[in-house]
């Protein structure tokens, strides 16, 4: 049998990110064959991940990463908020965000891409991390923005480490104007988006289903009134709804007397060039994930009964 040296264990750990004891076990089981040990670890990781796959993962981190005229945001979920403080988890999230910058930014492309510095994909690296940390984790979503000129500003709310927290926002400002002033404005708008959570840039981005649902709610409130009156109420109500949920029509959080579109128009004079907000991304951790209600006392009792 081949000698399992510390150097061999370190080499396997560097390639896979698996724990030292798992690496030693893998090498022992495969008689020191690195490639076979990698396969052994993958199978073990897949088995562990499969056991945890049904568990709700609504905690974790949202991260933003930027480079020049490109920026990306991702959300990686875990079961508990303790994992967000884990350096290995944070490192994975950071590297996955960098991968998003070098792909088309979709979560499928990120998952399939090679993990930086390793021979495995991002998805395979996450599987190994699940086996190491012991919680279910998911690469939930990813997005990428770009500008031909201008800036992509970012903001992270509830930051745990730099660029990673509970809410991540990107804002694309297309302009040939002063970059420093654009960056300041972009960050203010990013903070606005984090606070007010617009559904879309403007009315054209609101789905017909959402509009129909809002109209139905308005009509239900005014049942019994003449049809023409109901129609006017619904029309007025939808306009008010757009002002509440579309970014360009919202009252600017830093100056409620102006809409975001007015702020952008006025800023053109300050930056010295035409200015257009072309897109934004807002990821809030666990948004839309139904969390399980757990009875802690019952959970402890059940665990004690199994031991």
Swiss-Prot record:
Record InterPro entries: EF-Ts_dimer_sf (IPR036402), Transl_elong_EFTs/EF1B (IPR001816), Transl_elong_EFTs/EF1B_dimer (IPR014039), Transl_elong_Ts_CS (IPR018101), UBA-like_sf (IPR009060)
Localization (cell): Cytoplasm
GO molecular function, one term: translation elongation factor activity
Similarity comment: family membership: Belongs to the EF-Ts family.
Stored HAMAP family: EF_Ts
Function: Associates with the EF-Tu.GDP complex and induces the exchange of GDP to GTP. It remains bound to the aminoacyl-tRNA.EF-Tu.GTP complex up to the GTP hydrolysis stage on the ribosome.
Listed name of the protein: Elongation factor Ts
Organism: Xanthobacter autotrophicus (strain ATCC BAA-1158 / Py2)
Gene from which the chain derives: tsf
